[in-house]
C-alpha cells in the first residue's frame, strides 16, 4: 500500500463525517449514516445537529455500526458568551444521546480581552458532559493571531476540554496547517497529549491534505498519538476523496463542501 493510501485509510477512520446545514433533513442524516460505513472501515463518528441524534442512533444500530459515535454541536456557530444558554444546549445534547459534543468557544469575548467567560463556559459545559467527550471549537480563522489562538487553546485545556478544534466551518477561513501547528504545540507544551486531542475542521478536502495534517501530528506528538481518541477530521467532502484514493468506487459520499 502506498504512503498516500495508508494515510487515506488512517484518515478515514479518524473522520467526524459531518452535515451541519440549514437544510438538513432526516433523509440526509440517514444517508450520512450509510456513508459512515464504508467497505474499508467506518468513520470514527458522524457530526450532526442535536435534533437528528435519535434518527442517527436508530440508523447506525440498524445498519450494524452502533460503534460509530454521534457528535453534535452547541453554542453553534456564533460562539456567544451566554454561559447559561451554552450549558443548557449541552445538557440537551447529552439528553438526546450524544456521544460527543462540539461546543463553540466565546472567541469574540477573548478578542475583546475577556478570558474568564471562555474558561467558565468550557468548564460548565464539561461538567454537563461528564464522561461524554467535549470538543471545543476556538474559531482560529477569526482569532487569526498566534497569541490569541494559543491563549484560547490553553484556556480550553485548563477548563477541561477533551479536544481542541479549529473551526465551525461557517466562517471564511477554517482549518489551516499553520493554525493546526499552533494548537498541537500547545498540547505538547502543556504536557497534556495523553488526555487532550485535536480536530481540524473545514478545508481538509483531499487525501493529500489529510496526510499532511497527520504527518504534522506525528512530528509534534509522536507517531502513536493520533488515534481516534486524540485526533479527528471534521469534514464531509473529504470522504469521497479518501475512498477514491483507496480505489473504493461503489460508495460515494455527498460532496457538499464543509
Curated annotation (Swiss-Prot):
GO terms for biological process: 2-deoxyribose 1-phosphate catabolic process; carbohydrate catabolic process; deoxyribonucleotide catabolic process. SUPFAM superfamilies: Aldolase (SSF51569). Its EC number is 4.1.2.4. It comes from the Bacteria. Pfam families: DeoC (PF01791). Signal peptide: none annotated. This is Deoxyribose-phosphate aldolase.
Amino acid at each position: 500500500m502506498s504512503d498516500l493510501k495508508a494515510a487515506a485509510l488512517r484518515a478515514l477512520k479518524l473522520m467526524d463525517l459531518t452535515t451541519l446545514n440549514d437544510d438538513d433533513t432526516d433523509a440526509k442524516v440517514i444517508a450520512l449514516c450509510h456513508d459512515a460505513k464504508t467497505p474499508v472501515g467506518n468513520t470514527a463518528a458522524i457530526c450532526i445537529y442535536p435534533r437528528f441524534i435519535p434518527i442517527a442512533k436508530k440508523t447506525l444500530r440498524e445498519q450494524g455500526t452502533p460503534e460509530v459515535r454521534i457528535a453534535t454541536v452547541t453554542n453553534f456557530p456564533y460562539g456567544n458568551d451566554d454561559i447559561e444558554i451554552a450549558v443548557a444546549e449541552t445538557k440537551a445534547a447529552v439528553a438526546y444521546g450524544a456521544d460527543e459534543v462540539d461546543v463553540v468557544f466565546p472567541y469574540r469575548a477573548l478578542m475583546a480581552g475577556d478570558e474568564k467567560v471562555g474558561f467558565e463556559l468550557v468548564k460548565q459545559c464539561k461538567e454537563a458532559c461528564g464522561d461524554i467527550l467535549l470538543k471545543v471549537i476556538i474559531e482560529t480563522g477569526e482569532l487569526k493571531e498566534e497569541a490569541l489562538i494559543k491563549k484560547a487553546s490553553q484556556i480550553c485545556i485548563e477548563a477541561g476540554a477533551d479536544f481542541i478544534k479549529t473551526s465551525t466551518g461557517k466562517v471564511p477561513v477554517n482549518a489551516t496547517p499553520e493554525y493546526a501547528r499552533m494548537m498541537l504545540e500547545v498540547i505538547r507544551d502543556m504536557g497534556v497529549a495523553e488526555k487532550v486531542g485535536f480536530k481540524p475542521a473545514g478545508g481538509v478536502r483531499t487525501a493529500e491534505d489529510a496526510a499532511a495534517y497527520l504527518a504534522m501530528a506525528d512530528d509534534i506528538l509522536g507517531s502513536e498519538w493520533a488515534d481516534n481518541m486524540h485526533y479527528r477530521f471534521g469534514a464531509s467532502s473529504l470522504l469521497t476523496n479518501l475512498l477514491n484514493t483507496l480505489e473504493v468506487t461503489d460508495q460515494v459520499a455527498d460532496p457538499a463542501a464543509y
